[in-house]
């Protein structure tokens, strides 16, 4: 029986392509493909599991993106399976909480019910009272708030020399 041996330098460089897919990633719960059930070496010693080939599966999952730009903080969350009445967005302490739930209903594969909750830490320079949310026609929920503009001018900080060692060792002469 022939056994394919891959050299460590080759395997290490492309480990993410050869290694098994991570089960507990953001698109957990989506359907699996037949190729996911086998290690790549079973299918062929030269078979690669390119992550970008799974793009359609990723697009259909509830992807989340958080951005901290110069003038604003924003969250984009795919909630296309929920109506506005099934979504709740609230500020609780230093967090934005987004909750979506719909009861069992029929889709093209059978019956499905969905329930999710996500929490995002509000940056310290964003006023929680200024946060707004909107839902696009294609099902993307956007939660955003302006960042406070700091008018702190740039300045040089002088370095002073201390006589006592910081780590408790005697200074070298």
Curated annotation (Swiss-Prot):
Q: Which residues bind Zn(2+) 2?
A: 102, 104
In its UniProt record, which GO terms are filed under biological process? negative regulation of apoptotic process; protein refolding; response to heat
Per UniProt, where does Zn(2+) 1 bind? 81, 109
Record-annotated sHSP domain positions: 54-162
Q: SUPFAM superfamilies attached here?
A: HSP20-like chaperones
- N-acetylmethionine-modified residues are 1
Any Pfam family matching the protein: HSP20
Q: Which UniProt keywords apply?
A: Acetylation, Eye lens protein, Metal-binding, Zinc
In terms of domain of life, where is this protein from? Eukaryota
A Gene Ontology molecular function term for this protein is: protein homodimerization activity
Function recorded in the entry = May contribute to the transparency and refractive index of the lens.
**Which family, according to the similarity comment?**
Belongs to the small heat shock protein (HSP20) family.
Which PANTHER family does the protein's record reference?
Answer: ALPHA-CRYSTALLIN B CHAIN (PTHR45640:SF5), HEAT SHOCK PROTEIN HSP-12.2-RELATED (PTHR45640)
How does this chain assemble?
Heteromer composed of three CRYAA and one CRYAB subunits. Aggregates with homologous proteins, including the small heat shock protein HSPB1, to form large heteromeric complexes. Inter-subunit bridging via zinc ions enhances stability, which is crucial as there is no protein turn over in the lens.
Q: What is this protein called?
A: Alpha-crystallin B chain
State the organism named in the record: Aquarana catesbeiana
State which gene encodes it. CRYAB
């Amino acid at each position: 029986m022939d056994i394919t041996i891959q050299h460590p330098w080759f395997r290490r460089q492309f480990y993410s392509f050869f290694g098994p897919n991570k089960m507990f990633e953001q698109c957990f719960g989506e359907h699996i493909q037949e190729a996911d059930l086998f290690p790549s070496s079973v299918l062929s010693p030269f078979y690669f599991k390119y992550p970008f080939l799974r793009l359609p599966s990723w697009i259909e999952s509830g992807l989340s993106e958080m951005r901290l730009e110069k003038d604003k903080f924003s969250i984009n969350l795919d909630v296309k399976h929920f109506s506005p009445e099934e979504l709740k967005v609230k500020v609780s302490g230093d967090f934005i909480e987004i909750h979506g739930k719909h009861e069992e209903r029929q889709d093209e594969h059978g019956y499905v019910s969905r329930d999710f909750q996500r929490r995002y830490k509000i940056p310290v320079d964003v006023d929680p009272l200024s946060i707004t949310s909107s839902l696009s026609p294609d099902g993307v929920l956007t939660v955003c708030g302006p960042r406070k503009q700091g008018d702190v001018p740039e300045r040089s900080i002088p370095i002073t020399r201390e006589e006592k060692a910081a780590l408790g060792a005697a200074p070298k002469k």
